[in-house]
């Protein structure tokens, strides 16, 4: 979700200065206030319906009058009144129309689809969990329909330890024979005793419930802090492998440290070696995320994957390079590859011995981060994925990351989205000769996200590509040669299709200059996104700098963490033919 900056008031008027987030908050508050003031809903008689329809018509007329008034120049005080009145009238009209609608006359199959849409459209998981209960409290008919729809209950979040997992058990029972999407999560907010993480015995009790329907599990996500419950999980998956016929997605996250188990609290006598995943019986699994844990890679059958996500593993506990290459070669439909502080073991002779890149024709997204830049260079070099649409580079270790971009130049001509976190490019002519050709090699790029970087990166976009299209062009040009290049054809603009950038922890003056210079180069941005954390941390002077730019309405947006920007959503929709 992204909201426009400096909203004047919550308003649905479409005048370009409203905030989507503020309007939603206003609407929710106003509608709850109105609903609480109304009597319990009932079936209306003909005369009552006629009166309500007249009231709806009056509200439509009033809404139209408010909208026309807002289109005329009016004083600020009157504008505030009209916006607030308009919002209230829209809320009242919505409630009237909802109460008039004969919902219980709809066929059961349509009601079921509406219930599912409502539950699966919630902003966060806890809200969706409670909403399913709320549906059963409205009336007998809704309760009957909801309880007998197994699909409505098949997504279960085992996080109710304070309730003895009674809620999860109820969902588990109501899911019947439906395929199951399960999440086991341990965090300090949900624990019986704060500061006391889940134990091996706790995990055993949960798995005793789940494995009753092991042949129905389609997705399993586990988030715990310590090794013991994960060792129990891996052992149970190992022993139950023959019944996990429908398991397609598995995520295992160990949030605590250390990376290796040791000490008296870690029973190595029972787990002397890393375990395989599901005893190697993982033919249907296509989505794997392993965070803070490693496997017996050679005995784990990791093939036919669409998503491979490895995080936080010591360099010597990842898969061997040969095994990793086999995993990639056996996954021709791989769409997302993420290596975050984890990856294959880089052989000592990796630079002397050539490794032909693995062809990944359907790979769309690549993420590399939290390791030495030399590792990133090696990993980028062992794949050939010309159809990648999105690349993320974050927190790479090293003083200068330019050589990584040299390796990537020409490899990703279809790239549309680029995210750079704390990428370091040492300023100088030599690195300019690396970075400009890299940018020229991604001419279709539409969106760039940058965080925690020096503004020098933005300066690269002002360069005329004609001075870097050939390596034999000297870095220090004589005046005659420079004039000859300038006289030869039109300027080559860097990333001419770039539509938007998102910035975080970047000098605001450089950002403003970038926006104005793109406009001067006749390739203006459509949007500037500012990350919420950066927006909240802006000084009054920085805020004033933005406000004095007099940007077009809807140009500057504040983005919410962990959400795609509107342009990213639009790009992915186009990529997938939506």
Model regions: which residues?
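Leucine-rich repeat
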Residues: 2-578
